[in-house]
A protein has these predicted regions:
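A short, charged, and often flexible helix/loop element on the N-terminal side
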Residues: 1-2, 140
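Serine-dependent carboxylesterase/thioesterase catalytic core
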Residues: 2-97, 116, 121
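C-terminal catalytic-base region of ester-bond hydrolases, centering on the histidine
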Residues: 95-169
């Protein structure tokens, strides 16, 4: 993720273009989800059917905004996130179903950066993950990092990729 958002979206587009098959699904965690959204907007591929965003700050990032204002810490936010925050939201083509998975276990950067709205996953607030184009969303009791290793999250991602909706109980 050392490249900018546009470069990362282009690289993902080239990877998708080189991938065989009629149906392609994407899963992106945090900035990876923003790269997937940027790719969909810039390089739409009709084979991309479903996308799951895990803890992606679609509506902005309080933690990143604080880091960007703090001398010496701006680099921690990363170029892709800095570009996402600075650019207008790209319109998304309607061919892909989008699911948003957020966490509500507040462990991480948000514990030392004041003002992160609750509920949050310790890095991104649930409110920041929302995306109007999403067909479904779910919040699970995991932190930003835990969602990568959580069996429950994996099951929910699989459910969305299979059916276009999460398992709400």
């Amino acid at each position: 993720m050392g490249q900018g958002l546009q470069q990362n979206a282009g690289a993902l587009s080239r990877f998708v273009a080189a991938t065989g098959g009629d149906n392609i699904h994407l899963v992106g965690h945090s900035l990876g989800g923003l790269v997937a959204l940027s790719m969909l907007a810039q390089y739409p591929d009709p084979r991309v059917r479903r996308v799951v965003l895990m803890g992606s700050p679609c509506m902005g990032s309080h933690c990143a905004a604080v880091l960007l204002r703090t001398p010496g810490l701006a680099a921690l936010a990363g170029r892709s996130l800095k570009e996402w925050l600075a650019l207008p939201r790209p319109p998304l083509p309607g061919q892909a179903e989008i699911g948003v998975l957020s966490g509500s276990r507040s462990l991480g950067l948000g514990r030392i950066i004041p003002g992160l709205p609750h509920p949050n996953d310790g890095v991104v607030s649930v409110m920041e993950t929302r995306l109007p184009e999403a067909g479904d969303s779910i919040t699970l009791p995991v932190s930003h990092a835990e969602m990568l290793l959580s069996r429950t999250c994996a099951d929910q991602v699989a459910a969305f990729l299979e059916s276009g909706s999460f398992k709400h109980e």
